[in-house]
Swiss-Prot record:
Ranges where the Myosin motor domain occurs: 51-730
Encoding gene (name): myoA
SUPFAM superfamilies for the chain: P-loop containing nucleoside triphosphate hydrolases, SH3-domain
Localization: Cytoplasm, Cytoskeleton, Actin patch
InterPro entries: Fungal_myosin-I_SH3, Kinesin_motor_dom_sf, Myo1_CA, Myosin_head_motor_dom-like, Myosin_TH1, MYSc_Myo1, P-loop_NTPase, SH3-like_dom_sf
Region feature Actin-binding, mapped onto this chain: 419-501
Name under which the protein is recorded: Myosin-1
Amino acid sequence: MGHSRRPAGGEKKSRGFGRSKAAADVGDGRQTGGKPQVKKATFESTKKKEIGVSDLTLLSKISNEAINDNLKLRFEHDEIYTYIGHVLVSVNPFQDLGIYTDNVLQSYRGKNRLEVPPHVFAVAESAYYNMKSYKDNQCVIISGESGAGKTEAAKRIMQYIASVSGGTDSSIQHTKEMVLATNPLLESFGNAKTLRNNNSSRFGKYLELEFNTNGEPVGANITNYLLEKSRVVGQITNERNFHIFYQFTKAAPQKYRDLFGIQQPQSYLYTSRSKCYDVPGVDDSAEFRDTLNAMNVIGMTEGEQDDVFRMLAAILWIGNVQFAEDDSGNAVITDQSVVDYVAYLLEVDAAQVNKAFTIRVMETARGGRRGSVYEVPLNTVQALAVRDALAKAIYFNLFDWIVQRVNASLTARGEVANSIGILDIYGFEIFEKNSFEQLCINYVNEKLQQIFIQLTLKAEQDEYAREQIQWTPIKYFDNKVVCSLIEDKRPPGVFAALNDACATAHADSSAADNTFVGRLNFLSQNPNFENRQGQFIVKHYAGDVSYAVAGMTDKNKDQLLKDLLNLVGTSGNQFVHTLFPEQVNQDDKRRPPTASDKIKASANDLVATLMKAQPSYIRTIKPNDNKAPKEYNVGNVLHQIKYLGLQENVRIRRAGFAYRQTFDKFVERFYLLSPKTSYAGDYTWTGDAESGARQILKDTSIPAEEYQMGITKVFVKTPETLFALEAMRDRYWHNMAIRIQRAWRNYLRYRTECAIRIQRFWRRTTGGLEFIKLRDQGHQLLNGRKERRRMSLLGSRRFLGDYIGVGNKGGPGEMVRNGAGISGSEDILFSCRGEVLVSKFGRSSKPAPRILVLTNRHVYIIAQNLVNNQLVISSERTIPIGAIKAVSASNLKDDWFSIVVGSPQEPDPLVNCVFKTEFFTHLNNTLHGQLNLKIADHIEYNKKPGKLATVKVVKDPAVARDDSYKSGTIHTGPGEPANSVSKPTPRPKQVSARPVTKGKLLRPGGPGGGPSKLAARPTPAAQPLPRATPQPAAPQPAARAVPQPVAAVAASHTRTGSTASVRAPPPPPPAAAPAPKKPTAKVLYDFNSQQSNELSIKAGEIVQIVSKEGNGWWLCMNMTTSAQGWTPEAYLEEQVAPTPKPAPPPPPPAAPRSTPAPATNGAAAAAKAKPAPPAPPAKRPNMAARKAVPTPPPAPRDSAVSMNSHDSSGGSGRGTPNSMSNASLAGGLAEALRARQHAMQGKQDDDDDW
């Protein structure tokens, strides 16, 4: 039996455990399935080690001492709950352990008791689950002595059931609130501080929660027993009256203080006699607010609350009526004002109150006829008794009225299907002086112990014998003899003797007591009874108790004098008549029922109610008499263990069966688990119920030693077996639901896939029509006047517009937008990287990279500059759309055009953009088709404000791809004919048809499709791994294990004809990647430097090439001295690195190693020839003003390249040295700008006319 531990932090988890209809444990078995769900093992750092054993049936040695030691060990570690099978043993911790929080409560939902540690919530879960699953009424019997924690356990059960019982209807929620509100209300009127318990229940309560067929609470009913009304008029030292008196006197609102004269508790005799006004840790004012709130939740009106508090005030003032003796020894009232106030509160005449307290009206009868009436004065003792009798009667009837009012509010608001009862009654009591109240309390506890014995001990053994189950009988003490001693009439028991004494000598209390003592002599032969002088001893199951005889007969009479009944009958307050509804019948000669008769009838009714339900048990234990946490009195607890019979309970549990059920009910519950008893949820077994039960147990693989078959029932030994059966049953429905869900999901998947395929086809057919339409507008705008580039006519070309993403949120596009200050209200129509021809003083015009952005309002030319090593993006030129007069372009395929503005302050921009036609189209649409597009053999623009200039465009077949601008002329290659249009959109690549769905519920071709092609496709045979061919590779990171495919692993273990005799050697590792070599050159001629930025070289030397310039000079480095400088290109011969030969094939190496031919010394041959060196170029780069930058091969044209691109020209690839090799945005652009500045230094402006 596995048990989980409580997690760290002090909070416990628990689980519900079920019980059968034959009063045995029925586990709910709610687990994840029949087969255990194996999870990956992990280290549970927060898991606590179990303290002792959580179930006493697991003890290696069964004895009272072993049980005590285990309880003590767990108590010291704050583990207060322990199981005996399905019985919960609870030790009162006298402190809050934090184990009743909402999180802990939720952890019990749907759990059986083997999944989490013991807890009172587990009992509540079990009772609620069994009520819903098996439709049986449940009850929870909480037993133990006063102060052991019975009331707290009852409240926690109510808390749990109210939380998990569901129901969203407002009436159901209101019912839950009212049920919970009964706790503070009844506790304030029925609980008090005693020497053993600060919140001792001084009445018994059986709360019956009523549920509908859905397990939702619809009502409740409360039955109260044995209110200790004598506490109203007197308490011993350090005990208190009922809580409500202290709450009312301390926290009564001013309204009640003025209306009822309420003062502090020290002002009243009934609350000050014991000199105890407070309870440690209890705020009476806060408790009074809770009481008022509970009254409101229950539905008490303000008038009803006023009547209740009027009666409480009347009781307090009645206690302050004092008496003195007159000259004749009769009682007289000392303070008439108190009587007047009592009369005001009861709304009766003050003179009648005075007469009722001091005079008794007696009537003589003769021959069955009414005789004379006499008024007999009372002495002070008799007067005090009458006063106290009235106070006790008012409070007793008031408490009954409150219970009835609560029941009226909790009346079921729907059909009641089942119920759960919770019995909370004060436990066994043994005081120094025990009287009639203790006899009644202990008698009820004897009856409860008898139920426990009958249902858990005797009934269990009787059933085993009746069902012919193999069983070893266990001896136990049956306390039925003690119950008979107290309640039997023949032979007369204690109650019968007491009633006889009251009837024989009713006039004199002392005579009645003496008569009672005489009657008790007839019980002296009973071994469980001893009669002593003035007292008698009853040997209860909890121990021997000595009861004092004095005053018992008066308490048993339980009658209110007719004088007091007549007094309250004259009251003008209707609520008083409600409390005392009976009318005084002067002619009734029948003996009214005594208190012992009432308690005996109530106890028998309670037993009958409990026997109709399936009980769960909580046995509470009080660890010490000091109400101190962490204190464990071994002797006291051992005594409780003995009289609660825990040892016998453990022995019977160890030898018994956890679950039993009739054959037909068992088959009805579990027939789904066998394929021979069910099909598709229907019962198909044709044999009898017993054979069906055997078949179910066989098909579920339950071991034979785990169950026995009786005459009418099947007996399952351990709860784990039952939990497994319940789990399998739950899994059956789970599997059925999964099947339905799988079919439905497969259908939804099929429908979705069909829709997707239709949408995909539609998008392929109609997708991008807007972009294609825009592209066709571009063709119409050019109107066959301009040659086209081949890539512009591709069928897949679309006019997408915003290539940089300036209109997007986030990314480089947003940074460009923010840097250029483009308003968020402007729509981005077009963005692209390009170049603008820039003229500077003393220099030639050169193309510079720019970003071209077109919105619905402006054309932005955006520059990116490096300022203090920081990239700054700004708008260099902002042109309103309305200011554009024309756009000028050539009739060749070049990408240059000018935006003619004619501004008197600024020149017109000459722009190079690969997406020129798209720009023209968007600009034309923005101008509503009014764009003046000039196409000629040249480009016109205002180079300076007011100065018109032309740029020649020359077709040069030597220009392979890109345009080049130099000295006012653009050189471009031949293009496609001017009347060319875009090619048709290419058809997508054909792919093999895929099935719409996969799975067995729907065929791959769909619900009406043909057979699956996937099923007919042969599985490829496993192939051996190919041999790896070594080849140069780039440096790789550290190798890690890579799982092989299953086919490859299977092939590696397959013996074939070629590998059966000789095992192939492992493939060699791949060759290490060679380090990249830097370009070098051999010096052909001597060169002596003339300037400081030149490098002197000697013929035959090998120098490293740092960079190459197109003007005839290379920047080289002496590999010996590391000196750098410019050298003539004609003086050098670049060394080409030899291509490495592939590595030889893997072994066996059969071919011999070849000897390479000796290399020719080219340098020596060149030295022998001694040709004349050529003249160095006229121009040399300026070493001081130029930083050497490696020149990579030309990049493809791309105007939508990202800002981290390697192409500094923005994709045009013309006019600007490429230097963007850094990965970062700022670094790449900064490097490009710096390189361009260096390149522009030292140049002459060939066509500058400044």
